[in-house]
């Protein structure tokens, strides 16, 4: 039996470990997320959070999440939003959403660190298939009575491919 030098063995282990990390890092994530910082943490009603994402797989269903980051000083337990989604070669369809962020009894929902809270809220009741492949546009405006709406740090949209069981 042949002896392997310790340095050769360490090199071999390092190369194998690095290759595994590289291969895991190259795995395609079936997720899109775009968050936009709200200027001065004062969300004006005419400031729209916009973006686009591409859908190639129309056979799979997706979950759509609203992602919102606010401070502990945010004055309300909810936020009203006007969310628009536009399919390729179609017009933008808007829906008004009352997003609950917390309650006086249980406090803020989501994850908090110090005085910053982030919440991800599922917008569709069940997984949604996109009927057309291509680029989808989204637009999000706050429609609260306060203008500007203070203490909102960022807002965005997350689209996740639903894994088949």
What is each residue range found by the language model?
Residues 75-81, 151-154:
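Short coil-to-beta strand junction motifs in C2/discoidin
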Residues 101-130:
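Extended, solvent-exposed segments with strong compositional bias
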Residues 27-30:
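Bacterial signal peptide processing site
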Residues 66-74:
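Short amphipathic, basic-aromatic surface patches that mediate peripheral association
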Residues 22-25:
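C-terminal motif of bacterial Sec signal peptides marking the signal peptidase cleavage site
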Residues 131-147, 151-161:
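Internal, hydrophobic beta-strand segments that form the core of beta-sheet-rich folds
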């Amino acid at each position: 039996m042949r002896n392997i030098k310790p340095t050769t063995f360490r090199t071999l282990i390092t190369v194998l470990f690095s290759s595994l990390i590289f291969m895991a890092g190259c795995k395609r994530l079936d997720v899109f997320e775009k968050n936009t910082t709200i200027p001065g943490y004062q969300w004006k009603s005419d400031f729209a959070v916009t973006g686009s994402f591409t859908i190639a797989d129309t056979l799979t269903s997706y979950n759509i999440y609203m992602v919102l980051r606010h401070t502990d000083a945010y004055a309300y337990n909810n936020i009203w939003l006007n969310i628009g989604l536009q399919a390729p070669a179609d017009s933008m369809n808007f829906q008004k959403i009352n997003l609950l962020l917390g309650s006086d009894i249980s406090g803020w929902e989501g994850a908090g660190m110090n005085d910053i809270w982030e919440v991800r809220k599922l917008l569709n009741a069940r997984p949604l298939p996109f009927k057309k492949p291509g680029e989808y546009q989204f637009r999000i405006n706050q429609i609260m009575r306060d203008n500007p709406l203070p203490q909102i740090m960022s807002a965005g949209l997350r689209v996740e491919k639903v894994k088949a069981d």
